[in-house]
Amino acid sequence: IGRSFAIELAKRGGSVVCADINLEAAEETVTLLEQQGAKAFAMHCDVGNPEHVTHLAETAEILLSHPVTLVINNAGVGLGGKFDELSLEDWNWVMNINLWGVIHGCHAFVPKFKQLGYGAIINVASAASYTAAPEMSVYNVTKAGVLALSETLSAELRKFNIKVNVLCPTLVPTNIIKNGRIPGRYSKLADHALMNYAMTTSDAVATLTLNRLDRGQL
């Protein structure tokens, strides 16, 4: 979904900073954007590390030569398993990326948007934010947290002309399974679901979201 957003933003004339814990993946995205004639930069960033995200916020303005006006918090990982079989290390790993990563992103950019006088934040959650699929406890909790955070910030920051929205897509083919820690039996089920029951694509999600943002419907 992150790459799809970057490509769609480039199509609309946007300059993009692609931040990823996997720098090579970010650089691949930047190459695609540059082929479209877009101004794009790649940065290594572990969203679970607040210092990394603060550095991203400061450096992005320098790279772009203008303030950042849109932030998309998209990093996420998956983990399935029975609640009593998941370790606290598992919980910390998922929470640090899926929830704290979004908190860090918002915390780094909201003060800048207040100073600028406007801005937009799109947090990517999941339908798991409001459904309770069994054996997905840690994932469900993190996505519910992203939903709650986003709705709270939307109400709190509206008076500052800062728009905060949250996406809760259903099944969308992404790399979350490949990059997650999902036991084999769950991985096969997830792959089957994505292959056979995916209701949309990451490109469609990005296009629809940005269309609505451009029309002032978010």
What are these regions (language model features)?
Residues 23-24, 44-56, 88:
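The beta1-alpha1 cofactor-binding region of Rossmann-like NAD(H)/NADP(H)-dependent oxidoreductases
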Residues 82-83, 87-92:
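Substrate-binding pocket helix/loop in short-chain dehydrogenase/reductase
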Residues 14-28:
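Conserved glycine-rich Rossmann-like NAD(P)H-binding loop of the short-chain dehydrogenase/reductase
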Residues 1-17:
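Canonical Rossmann dinucleotide-binding motif of NAD(H)/NADP(H)-dependent dehydrogenases/reductases
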Residues 126:
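Residue(s) in the substrate-gating loop at a strand-loop-helix junction
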Residues 159-218:
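SDR active-site lid
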Residues 106, 142:
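Active-site helix of classical SDR
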